[in-house]
Amino acid sequence: MSDVIDLSDAERRMKGALEAVRHQFATIRTGRANPALLDRIEVEAYGTRMPIKSVASIGAPEPRLLTITPYDPNLLKTIERAIRDSDLGLNPQNDGKIIRLPIPELTEERRRELIRLVRHMAEEGRVSVRNVRRDEMHDIQRLRREGEISEDDERRAEAELQKLTDAYIKRIDEALAEKEAELMEV
């Protein structure tokens, strides 16, 4: 392939889409205590909305329990309310110093709901990867129209780009299968 066509930017962007999907998957409750579960929760503190991990230490002392220790004890009630109001369906217990967050078993219905959600997240990731491919294809075709690359180089670049796209979509599908298996584990 010609040196004119560099797919490293496309690969970087596809990798970013994959990492975004994996990060989203980490925030989905599976019945096991995982501090990443609280990553999406923001707390109203000091006149602004902040991620919970910025205002508290989060630990997992047991497989089914998270503990949240605020750096500022005045934020206990605010953190508790933010967790209670979130879509996680968890019931925080405030003892005046720390918040204990027991992670209950998932019901069959909730598991199916979460599987639908992770499938949607995976599809969004696939769409992101395909959008990167589309953008890169436009660039390759533009280079061909402007005469900067030959038709053979264009075909080779498109084939290489398709291989890259397929590889990243496969990785997203593998991450999805792993998360689905984790969610169905009783």
Curated annotation (Swiss-Prot):
Q: Name one GO biological process term.
A: translational termination
| Gene3D superfamilies from the UniProt entry | 3.30.1360.40, Ribosome-recycling factor (1.10.132.20)
The reply on keyword Disulfide bond is: no
Cross-referenced NCBIfam families, in alphabetical order? Answer: frr
Q: What is the role of the protein in this entry?
A: Responsible for the release of ribosomes from messenger RNA at the termination of protein biosynthesis. May increase the efficiency of translation by recycling ribosomes from one round of translation to another.
Q: Does the keyword Transcription regulation apply?
A: no
GO molecular function list? ribosomal large subunit binding
Record protein name field: Ribosome-recycling factor
- State where it is primarily located: cytoplasm
Family, similarity comment: Belongs to the RRF family.
Localisation: Cytoplasm
What are the UniProt keywords, alphabetically? Cytoplasm, Protein biosynthesis
Q: Which CDD domains match?
A: RRF
